[in-house]
Amino acid sequence: MKKIPVTVLSGYLGAGKTTLLNSILQNREGLKIAVIVNDMSEVNIDAGLVKQEGGLSRTDEKLVEMSNGCICCTLREDLLIEVEKLAKDGRFDYIVIESTGISEPIPVAQTFSYIDEEMGIDLTKFCQLDTMVTVVDANRFWHDYQSGESLLDRKEALGEKDEREIADLLIDQIEFCDVLILNKCDLVSEQELEQLENVLRKLQPRARFIRSVKGNVKPQEILHTGLFNFEEASGSAGWIQELTAGHAEHTPETEEYGISSFVYKRRLPFHSTRFYRWLDQMPKNVVRAKGIVWCASHNNLALLMSQAGPSVTIEPVSYWVAALPKLEQEQVKQQEPEILEEWDPEFGDRLTQLVFIGTDLDEETITKELDQCLLTEYEFDSDWSLFEDPFKWKLNQ
């Protein structure tokens, strides 16, 4: 059985996903396309627009509406069932999925990449995820990214427990894609567009970039590209590239617009209070920062710091290998020998590695300020458990 290729469209509310979808459908050149449109509201407005403007044939094609939920979580099971139905139908050459604007792309991609043992559905038998597309509104990106608002603030959340920040959602969509479409380019100046594109290229160096007006993109740009690879997409974010490959080559374009990046790496722990205060006053021209942090007051835990615009989070992700019992340490070292490359005789794998991406970054000042957050010699020799800890995590021990 021939596998049906699938393209997934992601992008924040109002970026132009439905307009792009209609543009593709109007120029599909004989392809029989099944379309799934996901909308958070009870009435699927986007699906109505696709029906009106997409020109889908009632006999050869199909539009599936998935409303009142999100395919990356609450409607994930429904997505599995619908895609399996469409694939087994045998009438379609292609499936295009338009995610809701608040959907994160990774869970959707996982739906096509792994077997769902609970439901007994294996989409990898019927489908091939071909392209992950993210649409960015060139006109409103900075407004949304720097707003400091959450989805709850804008009444766009999945529920009261959905505390996601808009900047974090935008980053999730940008950092996991094969094709990034900068839409509404007619609404910004060429200089603004150049700067935005160069910042986004720094955040997502792997993706193909396409500029568009009113979602006007050639179908071959997002259909049958063969670009998707889960492992590559997962490691494609700019901050990961910087950590794994050291300093990437800085192109003349990024230098022209003052866009730069650097890695801060230290083998001493931060004093939690000083680091917490620094996070609170991080320079506003840092667009993205992410990495692993070693804090003295949580000496056994590797902490993940993630910043996107005004949103900053820091939380434990795992135990340091050096904090594990000796037997477990040896097992991990055998399974992941690359750990030994960074292993320190005294501290083991404990270290801080942070990537900073931004415009007109003052690397020297940021480095100096962070160094002042490290333990002093006196503090290093004292009892770390007595340090004040401003990070109020509810740790599930």
From Swiss-Prot:
Reported phenotype of the disruption mutant: No effect in wild-type, but required for optimal growth in strains lacking the ZnuABC zinc uptake system.
SMART domains (UniProt xref): CobW_C
Source organism of this protein record: Bacillus subtilis (strain 168)
Protein name, as recorded: Zinc chaperone YciC
Residue interval(s) of motif CXCC motif: 70-73
Domain of life according to the entry: Bacteria
Keywords for the protein's UniProt record, in alphabetical order: Chaperone, GTP-binding, Hydrolase, Nucleotide-binding, Zinc
Domain CobW C-terminal span(s) in chain numbering: 259-374
Record lineage: Bacteria, Bacillati, Bacillota, Bacilli, Bacillales
Pfam families: cobW, CobW_C
Catalytic activity: GTP + H2O = GDP + phosphate + H(+)
CDD domains (alphabetical): CobW-like
Entries under InterPro entries matching the protein: CobW-likC_sf, CobW-like_C, CobW/HypB/UreG_nucleotide-bd, P-loop_NTPase, Zn_Chap_cDPG_Synth
EC number(s) recorded for this UniProt protein: 3.6.5.-
Induction: Repressed by zinc via the metallo-regulatory protein Zur.
Residues bound to GTP: 11-18, 73-77, 183-186
GO terms for MF: GTP binding; hydrolase activity
